[in-house]
């Protein structure tokens, strides 16, 4: 073997290079404490002294990280914008009408131009694809994650791929269970129900613990109008529920709103009183627009107004923190939740009804029934009247008793007292001058008229009949009717003269009037009623009653026939006080009377000319006014001392 190549030791100058100086310590130089002076230098500290890796500038790393963050932020905003767009869309939201979503899935724009419905087969085929479509909210993220796990780790049948294990298979199974119960799937199942109404009613009872029929009464027609409505809505999105309370305030006077959550989404129960009456169709359209749900997901009926249980439910729910209540509580809730109405069932008292009718001057049966029924909200006796099965009998009895009391009161009063009694029920803004001017306008001496009018009111025999004659449209009937109305008199008509009872109203009046007497009427008066015109007592036949003897009240007769020109009625001349109205009744350019003849002016007329009519008052009335006690038919309560 040849010798190793290289320089020979000891030849030339190579021997000088092998000399190595060993320095023990140099003066004035401090050795670092980190260095061990006794350790041999083996060269291990020079390992990886040179870095052969790729050098990347620091600025480039920061720029790359910033770019990644910007791209992630942009992607997040794009996804959020897409979700916002699809959230309110009636074609994508599972809380909306999914039938329209099926029609528009292939091409929304083309579907919007269709003039008729598509084939039912295509709709059924699209149900499966609709269930797996991302709706933009809910469990869509879980569904996407499930697909990623299946693609990366194995097949849907549970076989594992590379790096897979039992934990991943378990996660896939859980995601599959969640994915089959998404909000979209649940609403589709709701639409597939054969009896949707029964399903909604069952879900309502499951959530609220009572039947929907316990709170409402049914309207057969969708066009029946009502101000109070109970609305139950299913499948409402939570974002709509947050702002619904504010949106509905503008349309309602009172709202009672409850929100619950279930597998279908948010469920609304609302009692609402609108500002005006609405029917079910109008309410349904408004709720569909505000809640973004179809009409078949709504239950709309009016509330039970006479149910104590329903009223207590709304009252108890309104004071809890589960409800949002705005506005004034309806009166039907207040009426049935007050303690005295809940624990004390008031019995009907006829005397209270009669006293009310007497105080309000109601004598007709129809007026009594209508007005008293309207008091049921504030009067417990009226409420008991409505609950009774004998309302017609009570109304008839009340009217009879009220007329008896009024008739007895009138007969006990003299003419001056009656005029004062009627004046108390009339306003004080009248003027007596139009009546005086109208009398003078007809060419009648006012003093002569007042002399005859005084005897007429005092019912002096042979002076108690006032006859007004003249051409048509001269104001005769207007003048007489206005006076009869003020004094609450009665009117008789000659058309009923063939009846035996046509004079019966004269038995219950302080003044009477026979309007437009024709020649046959004058002949009848001359033949049968001379003593009636005299003001003497006469016999009058009454229906279902025995004959009665009455004194005819002051009687006003208007006629276009002047009996002074006919000699056949000469026996009536001394029994009447006749005045002629020759001039037409004056009207202004607007068709209103120039001389107003109303109750206020007649009151002022009597007050002005009271002394001229020679009405005498008793000393007690002059000093103390009216001393008569107010009529009272309701029995009082006796206060017993202890």
Swiss-Prot record:
Cell location: Host nucleus
SUPFAM superfamilies: Origin of replication-binding domain, RBD-like, P-loop containing nucleoside triphosphate hydrolases
UniProt modified residues of type Phosphoserine: 89, 93, 107
Binding site for ATP: 470-477
Molecular function per GO: ATP binding; ATP hydrolysis activity; DNA binding; DNA helicase activity
GO biological process, one term: DNA replication
InterPro entries to which the protein is assigned, alphabetical: Helicase_SF3_DNA-vir (IPR014015), P-loop_NTPase (IPR027417), PPV_DNA_helicase_E1_C (IPR001177), PPV_DNA_helicase_E1_N (IPR014000), PPV_E1_DBD (IPR046832), PPV_E1_DBD_sf (IPR046935), Rep_E1_papillomaV (IPR016393), Znf_lg_T-Ag_D1_dom_sf (IPR037102)
Location of the SF3 helicase domain: 444-594
Main location: host cell
Residues spanned by motif Nuclear export signal: 106-115
Role noted for this protein: ATP-dependent DNA 3'-5' helicase required for initiation of viral DNA replication. It forms a complex with the viral E2 protein. The E1-E2 complex binds to the replication origin which contains binding sites for both proteins. During the initial step, a dimer of E1 interacts with a dimer of protein E2 leading to a complex that binds the viral origin of replication with high specificity. Then, a second dimer of E1 displaces the E2 dimer in an ATP-dependent manner to form the E1 tetramer.
Protein name: Replication protein E1
Originating species: Human papillomavirus type 32
């Amino acid at each position: 073997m040849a010798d190793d190549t290289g320089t020979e030791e000891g030849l030339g100058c190579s021997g000088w290079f092998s000399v190595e100086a060993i320095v023990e310590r140099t003066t004035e130089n401090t050795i670092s404490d980190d260095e061990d002076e006794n350790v041999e230098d083996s060269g291990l500290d020079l390992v990886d002294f040179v870095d052969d890796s790729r050098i990347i500038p620091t600025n480039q790393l920061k720029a790359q990280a910033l770019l990644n963050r910007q791209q992630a932020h942009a992607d997040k905003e794009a996804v959020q914008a897409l979700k916002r767009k699809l959230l309110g869309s009636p074609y994508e939201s599972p809380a909306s009408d999914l039938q329209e979503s099926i029609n528009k899935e292939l091409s929304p724009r083309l579907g919007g131009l269709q003039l008729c419905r598509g084939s039912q087969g295509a709709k059924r085929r699209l149900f499966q694809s609709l269930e797996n479509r991302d709706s933009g909210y809910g469990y869509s993220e879980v569904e996407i994650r499930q697909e990623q796990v299946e693609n990366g780790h194995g097949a849907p049948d549970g076989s594992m791929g590379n790096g897979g294990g039992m934990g991943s298979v378990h996660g896939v199974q859980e995601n599959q269970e969640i994915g089959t119960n998404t909000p979209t799937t649940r609403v589709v199942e709701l639409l597939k129900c054969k009896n949707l109404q029964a399903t909604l009613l069952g879900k309502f009872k499951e959530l609220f613990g009572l039947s929907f029929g316990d709170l409402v009464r049914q309207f057969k027609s969708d066009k029946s109008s009502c101000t109070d409505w109970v609305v139950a809505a299913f499948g409402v999105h939570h974002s709509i529920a947050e702002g619904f309370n504010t949106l509905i305030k503008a349309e309602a006077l009172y709202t009672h709103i409850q929100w619950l959550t279930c597998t279908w989404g948010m469920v609304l129960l609302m009692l609402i009183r609108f500002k005006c009456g609405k029917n079910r169709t109008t309410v349904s359209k408004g709720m569909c627009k505000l809640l973004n749900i179809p009409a078949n997901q709504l239950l709309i009926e009016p509330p039970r107004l006479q149910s104590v249980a329903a009223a207590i439910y709304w009252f108890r729910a309104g004071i809890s923190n589960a409800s949002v209540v705005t506005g004034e509580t309806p009166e039907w809730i207040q009426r049935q939740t007050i303690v005295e109405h809940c624990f004390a069932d008031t019995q009907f008292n006829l005397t209270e009804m009669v006293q009310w009718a007497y105080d309000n001057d109601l004598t007709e049966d129809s007026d009594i029934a209508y007005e008293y029924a309207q008091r049921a909200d504030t009067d417990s006796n009226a409420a008991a009247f409505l609950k009774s099965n004998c309302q017609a009998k009570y109304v008839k009895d009340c009217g009879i008793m009220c007329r008896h009391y009024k008739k007895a009161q009138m007969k006990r009063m003299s003419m001056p007292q009656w005029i004062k009694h009627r004046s108390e029920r009339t306003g004080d803004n009248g003027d007596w001058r139009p009546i005086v001017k109208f009398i003078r306008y007809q060419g009648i001496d006012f003093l002569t008229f007042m002399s005859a009018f005084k005897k007429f009111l005092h019912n002096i025999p042979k002076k108690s009949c006032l006859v007004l004659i003249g051409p048509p449209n001269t104001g005769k009937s207007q003048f007489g009717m206005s006076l009869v109305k003020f004094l609450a008199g009665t009117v008789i008509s000659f058309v009923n003269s063939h009846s035996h009872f046509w004079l019966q109203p004269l038995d219950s009046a302080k003044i009477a009037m026979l309007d437009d007497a024709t020649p046959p009427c004058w002949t009848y008066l001359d033949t049968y009623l001379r003593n009636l015109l005299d003001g003497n007592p006469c016999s009058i036949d009454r229906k279902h009653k025995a004959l009665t003897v009455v004194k005819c009240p002051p009687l006003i007769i208007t006629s276009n026939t002047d009996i002074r020109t006919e000699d056949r009625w000469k026996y009536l001349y001394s029994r009447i006080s006749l005045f002629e109205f020759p001039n037409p009744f004056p009207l202004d350019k607007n068709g209103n009377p120039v001389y107003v003849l109303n109750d206020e002016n007649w009151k002022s007329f009597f007050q002005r000319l009271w002394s001229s009519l020679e009405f005498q008052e008793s000393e007690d009335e002059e000093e103390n006014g009216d001393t008569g006690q107010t009529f009272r038919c309701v029995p009082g309560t006796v206060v017993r001392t202890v």
